[in-house]
Amino acid sequence: MSIEEEDTNKITCTQDFLHQYFVTERVSIQFGLNNKTVKRINKDEFDKAVNCIMSWTNYPKPGLKRTASTYLLSNSFKKSATVSLPFILGDPVCMPKRVESNNNDTCLLYSDTLYDDPLIQRNDQAGDEIEDEFSFTLLRSEVNEIRPISSSSTAQILQSDYSALMYERQASNGSIFQFSSP
C-alpha cells in the first residue's frame, strides 16, 4: 500500500472512529427537535477537521476524540448546542471539578451521564478496555457561578442546564450538532 493510500485509509478510519460520538437524528427526535434545529456538518467540513486533528494527535489516542469535538465546536458555531462525546477514563480535561463563568461568557460543561461512582472508581483497573462503553454530554450554556460537579449531582445539573439550554435554543434558534452520513 502506498503512503498516499495509507493516509487515505487512515483518514477514513478516523472518520468512522469519530462519527459514533455525535448525536444521531434519533436522539434529536427523542428530544423533540425538528430539522431546523439540527445542524449537519457536511463531509467537506468533517474531512477538514479530521486532517487538522490528525496533524495534532496520533490516531487513535483518546485525545483525538476530544480534540475533534473541540475543533468542530469552536470552529462551527457560536450558538448553544448539545453534543454527545466520548467519556475518556482518567482524563481530567473531560471531567473538570467545577465550571467557572467569566463575566457571563459561554462555558463548557462536561458531565458523566451514564455511570455512577463505583464504576468511575474502576478507573485504574478498567483502562482503555471499557472506554467505548462510556459517554458524556457537553453542554454549552451560560453560568453565573461556580458549581461543583459530582456523580451524585450530575443528573440534577444536567437536567437544569438542559432546560436552560432548550429555553435559550427557542430564543436564539441554537443547534444540536450531528454529522451527516458520508
UniProtKB/Swiss-Prot annotation:
Organism domain of life: Eukaryota
GO biological process, any: reciprocal meiotic recombination
Cellular component terms (Gene Ontology): condensed nuclear chromosome
Keyword Transcription: yes
Swiss-Prot/TrEMBL keywords: Activator, Meiosis, Transcription, Transcription regulation
A Pfam family hit: REC104
Disulfide bonds: none
UniProt-listed InterPro entries: Rec104
Transcription in keyword set: yes
Assembly and oligomerization: Interacts with REC114 and SPO11.
Described function: Potential transcriptional regulator that is required to activate expression of a number of early meiotic genes including HOP1.
Protein name per the record: Meiotic recombination protein REC104
Organism name: Saccharomyces cerevisiae (strain ATCC 204508 / S288c) (Baker's yeast)
Gene giving rise to this polypeptide: REC104
